[in-house]
């Protein structure tokens, strides 16, 4: 669910997810649409595509189990749907961490109407 995603992002990046990524670029957070602005925004685009690939799942509300061991996210024993949701969230948290150097404050609250049509997943 969103709380677990935000928690993973905080653990991996040290950034509070909602204010840092909630309106970032064209693909992070609310109203995501459009060609990614940078590598950070691309992480969110890939995450959105990961969620889209989940059929019969509710990734924004489902609750899965995971742990934080030795600074590593470990998805727990979940049903297949929950396992994949956890893996999607883990991947975006790691991607955001790996691209912290591309984080651009100018994209933190980016006007979505300026976003061009996105690539297909």
From Swiss-Prot:
PROSITE patterns attached to this UniProt entry: PA2_HIS (PS00118)
Tissue note: Expressed by the venom gland.
InterPro entries: PLipase_A2, PLipase_A2_dom, PLipase_A2_dom_sf, PLipase_A2_His_AS
Pfam assignment, any one: Phospholip_A2_1
Alphabetical UniProt keywords: Cytolysis, Disulfide bond, Myotoxin, Secreted, Toxin
Cellular component GO terms held in the UniProt record: extracellular region
Entry's Gene Ontology molecular function annotations: calcium ion binding; calcium-dependent phospholipase A2 activity; phospholipid binding; toxin activity
Coiled coil: none
Compartments in which it is found: Secreted
Disulfide feature: 26-115, 28-44, 43-95, 49-121, 50-88, 57-81, 75-86
GO biological process: arachidonate secretion; killing of cells of another organism; lipid catabolic process; negative regulation of T cell proliferation; phospholipid metabolic process
Family affiliation: Belongs to the phospholipase A2 family. Group II subfamily. K49 sub-subfamily.
Protein role: Snake venom phospholipase A2 homolog that lacks enzymatic activity, but has myotoxic and cytolytic activities.
Subunit structure: Homodimer.
The name this protein goes by in its record: Basic phospholipase A2 homolog
Organism: Metlapilcoatlus nummifer
Taxonomic lineage from the root: Eukaryota, Metazoa, Chordata, Craniata, Vertebrata
């Amino acid at each position: 669910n969103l709380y677990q995603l935000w928690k993973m992002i905080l653990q991996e990046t040290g950034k509070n997810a909602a204010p840092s990524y909630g309106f970032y670029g064209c693909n992070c957070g609310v109203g995501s649409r459009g060609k990614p602005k940078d590598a950070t925004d691309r992480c969110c685009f890939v995450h959105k595509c990961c969620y889209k690939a989940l059929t019969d799942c509710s990734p924004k509300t489902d609750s899965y189990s995971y742990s934080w061991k030795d600074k590593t996210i470990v998805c727990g024993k979940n049903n297949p749907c929950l396992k994949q949701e956890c893996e999607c969230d883990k991947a975006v948290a790691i991607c955001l961490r790996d691209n912290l150097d591309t984080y651009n404050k100018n994209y933190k609250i980016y006007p979505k109407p300026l976003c061009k049509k996105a690539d297909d997943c």
